[in-house]
């Protein structure tokens, strides 16, 4: 197929996107596909024209545009198939506050949260007790994520987020370990247990640097907990109306409780990424995983045209 590989963009996660796309090109070409690399930052105005000249668009964007559903909506306008969630599901998943409302309504276990769209007054106090995890409401890759133990630390982190033009969401710091689980089609993949080495939580360095974290796959958490993680992952995927694939992140508490953190609709595709690691556990190499995502995207496009 003639594949338009859409990457780059202008979000703070641009470099992560480019790194993943560089890994995808040889895997696709080895399977006989003709790949056109398309950097959204350099030629956003040419997206629709380029999409019309290709059989499939592989989206490897992080943040907005891309995870916000804009690119998907544009591709839908010209009938170009792509992998993963459509515009609405992408937008809902990217907005953590909106997604958490949907999770809560669906009966999924998610932590309490405060949403702060603009810098509050000096007399304001967070509703939740310290310490708090503070992050961008629409950011990803654990960028602009911090732990605040008091108002001074909270103001510092919020200031960085607001300076980037984004809103703040904060949650209590939950004891436990992080578990992540992908969906491929309607099938949950084997979960991964994440133990950060660089830092005490899964931040940007832990996520993308070699040896930044120990990622144990399949997660050594027993069959019962594994099944529960997979059940919740599929439930979150469906609650947001997603398609094709996604990845859900959880905190596994000391009492074996599970708390859903968020769902990623365009999971990372670098050499250290989580979903490719999970796919390898079930026998799919990187090229086979990409092929499966394209098969799912083509089938989804046909359904929309019926």
Curated annotation (Swiss-Prot):
Keyword hit for Cytoplasm: yes
Domain ATP-grasp, first and last residues per copy: 100-295
Residues involved in Mg(2+) 2 binding: 262, 264
Coiled coil: none
InterPro entries registered for this protein in UniProt: ATP-grasp, ATP_grasp_subdomain_1, D-Ala_lig_Van_CS, D_ala_D_ala, Dala_Dala_lig_C, PreATP-grasp_dom_sf
Amino acids binding ATP: 127-180
Record's subcellular location: Cytoplasm
E.C. designation(s): 6.3.2.4
Catalytic activity: 2 D-alanine + ATP = D-alanyl-D-alanine + ADP + phosphate + H(+)
GO MF entry, a single one: metal ion binding
Pathway: Cell wall biogenesis; peptidoglycan biosynthesis
Membrane-traversing stretches: none
NCBIfam families named in the record: PRK01372.1 (NF002378)
Protein name: D-alanine--D-alanine ligase
Gene transcribed to yield this protein: ddl
């Amino acid at each position: 197929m003639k594949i338009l590989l859409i990457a780059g963009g202008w979000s703070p996660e641009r470099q992560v996107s480019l790194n993943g796309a560089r890994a995808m090109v040889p895997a696709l070409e080895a399977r006989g596909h003709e790949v056109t690399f398309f950097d959204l930052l350099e030629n956003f105005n040419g997206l629709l024209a380029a999409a019309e000249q290709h059989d499939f668009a592989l989206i490897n964007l992080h943040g907005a545009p891309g995870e916000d559903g804009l690119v998907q909506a544009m591709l839908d306008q010209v009938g170009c198939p792509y992998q993963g969630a459509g515009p609405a599901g992408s937008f809902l998943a990217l907005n953590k506050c909106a997604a958490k409302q949907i999770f809560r309504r669906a009966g999924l276990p998610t932590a309490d949260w405060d949403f702060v769209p603009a810098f509050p007054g000096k007399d304001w106090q967070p509703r939740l007790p310290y310490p708090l995890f503070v992050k961008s409401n629409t950011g990803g890759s654990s960028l602009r994520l911090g732990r605040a133990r008091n108002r001074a630390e909270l103001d510092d982190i919020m200031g960085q987020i607001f300076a980037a033009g984004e809103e703040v969401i904060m949650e209590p710091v939950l004891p436990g370990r992080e578990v992540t689980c992908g969906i491929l089609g309607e099938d949950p993949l084997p979960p991964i247990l994440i133990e950060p080495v660089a830092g005490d939580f899964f931040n940007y360095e832990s996520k993308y640097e070699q040896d930044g974290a120990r990622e144990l796959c399949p997660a050594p958490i027993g069959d019962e907990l594994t099944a529960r993680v997979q059940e919740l992952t599929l439930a979150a995927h469906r609650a947001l109306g997603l398609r094709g694939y996604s990845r859900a992140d959880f905190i596994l508490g000391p009492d074996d409780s599970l708390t859903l953190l968020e769902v990623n609709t365009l999971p990372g595709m670098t050499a250290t990424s989580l979903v490719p690691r999970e796919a390898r556990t079930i026998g799919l190499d990187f090229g086979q995983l990409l092929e499966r995502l394209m098969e799912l995207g083509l089938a989804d496009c046909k359904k929309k045209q019926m």
